[in-house]
Amino acid sequence: MTRTLRFAAPSLSLAILLVASLLGLNACSTTVPEGIASVTPFDIERYQGKWYEIARLDHSFERGLSDVSASYRQQPDGSVEVINRGYDSKRNDWRQALGRALLTGDTKRASLKVSFFGPFYGGYHVMALDQQNYQWAMVVGPDRDYLWILAREKRLQEGVRAHLLHEAGAAGIDTQKLIWVEQTRTDG
């Protein structure tokens, strides 16, 4: 069973947690952290689809989740539907959060703002990307405390992993704090 964040009583505490986390995103900053550039050129249509979370920095809204994925789908109004999903082994259940993303500024630059609750947005900036095939990406949030390494497959080639760790470290991100996400379930 998958639990989708809506405004139902059982998920209210999780929704409040997401809001608090988003508020903590550097006062809802949507700008790229100083000294980091978002990828250009960027094609949101090619970025659509399912991505597996390979690694992340720890935050309460994902703590304890394995088999995390993010799916992006462009909407007719130009926004992007975001579905984040992960398995909570303590509850023996899938958790899901629905969000909305908007490109900020230049549509050929990989900078978006994402909201999982109302008018509160946090920055989402693709700082590294397989621009030829769109098979892997590294995303930073509004500051260096938010980082995700994503891939189209559940595993990332060692050479790509080493490259991304080098890039993250060069950008001032503490790669020793990365959590390598377990991607073993086949029921999700």
Question: Each predicted region: which residue ranges?
Answer:
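Bacterial N-terminal signal peptides
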Residues: 13-24
